[in-house]
Amino acid sequence: MVRLRFAPSPTGYLHIGGLRTALYNYLYAKQKGGKFLLRIEDTDRTRYVEGAIENLIHELKWAGVEVDEGVCLDENGKITEVGECGPYIQSERVEKGIYNKYAEELIERGYAYYCFCSKERLDDIKNQQKADGKIPRYDGLCRGVSIEDAKKRIANGESYVIRLKLPENRDIVFEDVIKGKITINTNDMDDQVLIKADGFPTYHFAVVVDDHLMGITHIVRGDEWISSTPKHIYLYEALGFEKPTFVHLPTVLNKSGKKLSMRNDDASVEDFRLKGYLPEALINYLALVGWSPESNEEILSLDEMVKQFSFDRVSKSGGVFDVDKLDWVNAQYIRKMEVSELAKLVKPYLVKAGFIKEDICEKRLELITKTFQESISRLPEIVEQSRFLFENVVVEPDALKMRNVEHIEILKEKMKEELSQIEEMDEETAKGFMKKVQKASGFKGKDLYMPVRALLTGQVHGPELSNILEILGKGEILRRLE
């Protein structure tokens, strides 16, 4: 059985690129009848952000990327774990001594060593190497310290880290599913720290141990990790672990061709949720940033993506995240929604704007929703588009001309006469109202509809006029005609 994982660090809110990584892991796992895990890699305690784990879980669930195993939230919103390979939070695994056991094994077998170099010495080496135009790397001073001497120094209270002992001048070769064959020589690599002075493992060590113990068969992650993969390959060999399949995904880029970043772009999943994007639309579009389905369809459900997904059709180069295209995809999903469901989603925006009350009649809310369903691409847009219904009309320049056509007074008079004949502007009355005005006034087409629309809405174009009449109602229409 294939087992894939999404293993973010809780250093901030879920990034749109992280969601795509999680999605690709999920799609492949589901297609192959496997499991999708969520593991939290919190070994860098200096960058830990309070609430980030909850955000990661919440946004994945909102997006429909459901976890089979690992970290989740219980019914009270508290962090919990499900599965037999836990703990799934690395800091909890540290407490169990999982990593130290394997680090000591590596030392005993000559694949790692204790390093006692101070931060000051390491900084001096780094600065000198930079000044000499060299790539900064550890100079190997402690490689020759025997295990016996090292343990004496540790017993005397010296601070230490554990480093990986790389062989010299050896090519490490691996096959990446997307990028192909990759070769990196150990002379271009560093003796990576495995266990830090605080006893916590580094990412590079913990990720190998955890992926092995959790039975992960495919490592699917961003291509920024390619340069680190040879270290991981060597660790798999040194520990006697079976190597998984590696899949490095192309970067998600902004329109300028640079990596989409939290600092310069709205790049958190929460940003898109709060801007009124539907989870189905965001997931649909995000899947297409770097992957092309065989069917060439642009609108795909999660189930359809599971059926069609293949790493063979993932691009080697970065995919551009185009917000305009996302808007188009989101609009397609809005158009397809049942009015009753869409009404529930737009209601909070209309209530917040003060346009409607919480206890609004369901039928009226659905009428308002239906009126703008074809024209909005994000949920909050309904506020600006419907503003003319609930506030004093702001007349556009083109509408001003229409409000001053020669026959405008005739139209006003005939509309008032027809209004006097009805008790209320219900759906049936609204649909027949303009036909009666047409017959009574003798005007039709643009000569009828554009001036009436200008009078009632301050615009010359807009949604179905019969819907507007029904929403405004008899009293408000009369007020606007005065």
Provide a role label for each language-model segment.
Residues S227, L239-V395, T457-E482:
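Catalytic adenosine-cofactor/nucleotide-binding cores of aminoacyl-tRNA synthetases and other
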Residues E105-H248, L253-L260, S268, P293, ...:
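Active-site cores that bind ATP or allylic diphosphates and position pyrophosphate for catalysis
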Residues D426-I471:
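Helix-rich, typically C-terminal accessory recognition domains appended to large enzymatic cores
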